[in-house]
């Protein structure tokens, strides 16, 4: 048994300049693991609680009382004494002990950020002690599937101060032989998009996730630019065949739902400020009207995937969406399911989605995350491994995507080091796999539950 000998947490900064927690774990046999916890901007109401220093003795340390020293103290003073001496390879036991120590449904006592930091650092320490890559430790020797990247090249919603209500407009390079070739294709599209934006007089500043954040007149205008950038790069806007590059959307509809209607608040405000009537013809939608709007977009553009097309409380909207379009398009639940097994079971029973987004900090432990992934895959769903808008140089999700053969990873655009770090890690993993056997990149086939 390889015992944990030391656990130490500290407060550092994430990609938005906000405090987050980093945890180091040491083992008796010389293993070491360190993990940095991400943070989201648009969050589901049922997510595990990220503990901040509001109304504590640390409240005034950082802007907006966003410090995490309370979570740091919880690791160093409460969690550490309980897990020191345990075997670092017994991940589930350690995760369960932390869940029991917390004792709340959403980890609000110790903080999901405190618990997750320890959970991930333990796994990394075990892998390090065994002198193997994290993806091998988590997945064994079988996984060889490299994920198709979902690159958020146009940001909107809560991730950017622009006019777009949809949060992410992504490209998915499908028609390529390797992950590296796919990334090279995405690189060309990204830079050609910048060129086209500049040529049309748009700014090319980037949002939280490294994508451009122009003030477009409509969501359709954003999609038109994506199609043009794909063509300008010499690729095929579509799902199938050589050089195919598809589009994916994260609508994050909970952010523009007022409890009764879906309102494109940002586009509407832009229209009013410009006194223009020729922008999006409609800014307010019932659930049924929004479904029809998505149908128009799916008919016009090569969109393969839509995430959070409806608000997290609008189960009927999701069910209707999946029933109508789920045979040919990936219908992803994020805020709807928050990487929670019990909520995922409901979504499966209701046939509300055919894919789940996986975010480690939504649930708060590695074990629970793996449970959600395995349940989704067992039920015929795809599982998309995802970053958060507040990220760091931590590359855990890259290893996780390969370990579980998810086939898809969503980790931002091709700018900002916090996003690039994950892509660089995947390039290294692909090289590692090719040195032993052959890394697989199967493009369109990752959508194994869609009609061919």
UniProtKB/Swiss-Prot annotation:
One of its GO terms (molecular function) is phosphopyruvate hydratase activity. Disulfide bonds: none annotated. Its EC number is 4.2.1.11. Pfam families: Enolase_C, Enolase_N. Mg(2+) binds at residues 250, 307, 334. The keyword Electron transport does not apply. The active site is at residues 209, 359. It catalyses: (2R)-2-phosphoglycerate = phosphoenolpyruvate + H2O. InterPro entries: Enolase, Enolase-like_C_sf, Enolase-like_N, Enolase_C, Enolase_CS, Enolase_N. The keyword Lipoprotein does not apply. It is found in: Cytoplasm; Secreted; Cell surface. Catalyzes the reversible conversion of 2-phosphoglycerate (2-PG) into phosphoenolpyruvate (PEP). It is essential for the degradation of carbohydrates via glycolysis. NCBIfam families: eno. This is Enolase. It comes from Mesomycoplasma hyopneumoniae (strain 232).
